A protein has these predicted regions:
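N-terminal secretory signal peptides that target proteins for export/translocation
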Residues: 1-15
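Bacterial signal peptide processing site
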Residues: 33-35
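Residue-level hotspots at or immediately adjacent to binding/recognition sites across diverse folds
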Residues: 43-330
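Sec-dependent signal peptide recognition
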Residues: 16-23
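C-terminal motif of bacterial Sec signal peptides marking the signal peptidase cleavage site
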Residues: 28-31
Length: 330
């Protein structure tokens, strides 16, 4: 009898377990029945070519607002912060945009507070025109953007490293290594050609002409950005060129400066302390050139030169480091 009672109890427990399992399965089934995947009505948009936010903040210590008259960029020279060198800066569409090494770009509304992004190739030059920013750099890469924040990329034929770009008269003109000069009307479709074999370092527009400068004292001019006439103006390297106050001004190594009213006939002069001048611009009633000078202690000093006529210059130093680009405050 005891055995029989135990058997009945065991059988009863088995039945209860089976019932519990059945109820559990029904609950799971009903829960699954109620789930419906959410399908968005929005179309799937492929990722765009947007700069990536850096994992570590990019230093903008190499960006200087000088007397609220000029934005000057260079190496950041800050230990343990980063190695971002800012190479060029421009203004357009209500903001300043600067580009540099270490895959970086930065944007500012007021020229004081900057937002930096990464995800680019190294960029050497930038300009604004025809409603867009154009930045150029290594590998023949050209970046274009409406707002300086979201960028798209094209590559010029030959993939030659580009160093500078300007816009005027309905055309972008970019210059680079090995004699390459490229032009575009929209910033996205480019034609490249060779003008000589040296590296072109800078380009600007003024008085109806594009003017480009190169290593080994070369200066070239063009009325259309396509057909160029080159000549020698001195023997040192020219790094920067600008137009303002009805005059072209060219700057380079050993303190050399050249100026011209027409971009064809040039007069040369020299700044006495023989700096290396990397860039020049004109705005707010003066020319400003920036670069570096070697210090007896064995390092470079950031140097600014300013002039009202492009001939007579006054210098100012700004501590240890190098300066590479400049544009007027708007």
């Amino acid at each position: 009898l005891v055995f029989y009672i135990k058997a009945v109890e065991i059988k009863s427990k088995i039945v209860k377990i089976k019932l519990f399992c059945i109820v559990l399965c029904l609950c799971v089934f009903m829960a699954c029945e109620k789930y419906e995947p959410v399908i968005s009505d929005e179309p799937v948009i492929p990722p765009t070519d947007q700069p990536k936010e850096p994992q570590e903040p990019i230093s903008t210590d190499g960006i200087i607002n000088w007397n609220n008259e000029f934005i000057i960029v260079g190496d950041n020279n800050m230990a343990n912060i980063g190695s971002n060198d800012w190479n060029a800066v421009t203004y357009g569409n209500g903001r300043y945009v600067t580009v540099g090494d270490s895959n970086s770009a930065a944007c500012s509304i007021d020229g004081i507070n900057w937002t930096a992004t990464s995800g680019f190739n190294d960029l050497s030059g930038i300009c604004y025109g025809n409603g867009k920013f154009i930045a150029v750099g290594t590998g023949g890469n050209v970046r274009y953007s409406d707002d300086g924040g979201g960028w798209s990329t094209v590559t010029i034929p030959g993939k030659t490293n580009l160093r500078a770009v300007c816009y005027e008269n309905g055309k972008f003109v970019a210059v680079g290594e090995n004699g390459v000069i490229a032009y575009s009307t929209d910033g996205s479709s480019w034609t490249a050609k060779k003008v000589g074999s040296n590296d072109w370092n800078s380009v600007c527009y003024g008085n109806g002409k594009f003017v480009a400068v190169e290593n080994d004292g070369g200066v070239a001019y063009s009325t259309d950005g396509i057909n160029w006439t080159a000549k020698k103006v001195g023997s040192n390297w020219w790094y920067g060129v600008c137009y303002g106050n009805e005059k072209f001004v060219v700057v380079g190594t050993d303190g050399d400066v050249a100026y011209s009213t027409d971009g064809i006939s040039w007069t040369t002069t020299t700044i006495s302390d023989a700096p290396t001048i990397m860039a020049v611009c004109c705005g707010n009633g003066k020319f400003v050139a920036v670069g570096r000078i070697w210090n007896a202690s064995g390092y470079y000093i950031r140097t600014i030169y300013y002039s009202t006529d492009g001939i007579n210059w006054t210098s100012k130093t700004m501590g240890r480091g190098e300066l590479y680009g400049v544009c007027p405050v708007q």
